[in-house]
Amino acid sequence: MSEIISVAFETNGKGYLGYLLDLPGAFVRGKTIDQALSKVEQEAIIYQKWRGLRPRYNLKPKVVQIHYSSLMVEDADSEILLDFDKEKMEEKEFNQYIELIKKSGFSILTIYKNTELKNWLDETRRRKTFYGDVPISIQRIFEHIDSVQYYYLSRISTDIEEKKGFLERREYCLKKLKAIYLRENNSKIYITDHEKWTIRKVLRRFIWHDRIHAKSMVKILKKQKWMGLIDCYQDPFNFFT
């Protein structure tokens, strides 16, 4: 028997970005909605393996929301506030998100620290996108992931102190988010730079942003191995294992 998994989509007509609501940060992309939907089960399996869970199979995606955007969704630019993002958040669920963000951070760091050729350039990735030049080395991707941590926090907080170190910055962001959560749960919708945010959306986006760029890191490592530049690489997210 198939199990329903809810998916919310964002599109500008040129591409579709779908979020799997039951799996915070899990996502699919495609030129068409059908192409994106065809990837849902595999993304769910990969995500559950990363979490150390027994994968669920025979998943049937159900589209529960479609947001039409003028952003470059085909390049994974996103603004959607999921209906789910606005719902009340129990403390147990909040803490689960926090643990997932910590786990995701450790997974990113595992890839980075075990990479021999951090500054090797994958010239085939060179292009412009909505945030500037696409990072074409693992070093640049890691720096981008790191810098965006404070960006997400700044969507709902203006009182931010600079910390040194990737994990230190992440831990600081999570402590700030917890303080906000304990004060207002998930009851407030913030509008920052014309985009709507809630605490749950910030938490979800942390994991999603890690995953989308970690996949690029592992693709570069996979290419390095194929070219004979390295013997092996780490893939803690299980993207290609």
For the regions a protein language model found, what residue spans apply to each?
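Acidic/histidine-rich alpha-helical segments that form the ligand environment
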Residues: 87-115, 161-190, 197-216
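A short mid-domain helix/strand-loop element embedded in enzyme catalytic domains
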Residues: 76-88, 101-126, 142-151
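Short secondary-structure junction/hinge motifs that connect adjacent elements
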Residues: 57-64, 121-124, 187-189
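Short, charged, surface-exposed hinge/linker loops at domain edges
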Residues: 2-4, 45-94
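Short, contiguous alpha-helical
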Residues: 7-15, 23-29, 39-56, 120-167, ...
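The catalytic Nudix box helix
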Residues: 36
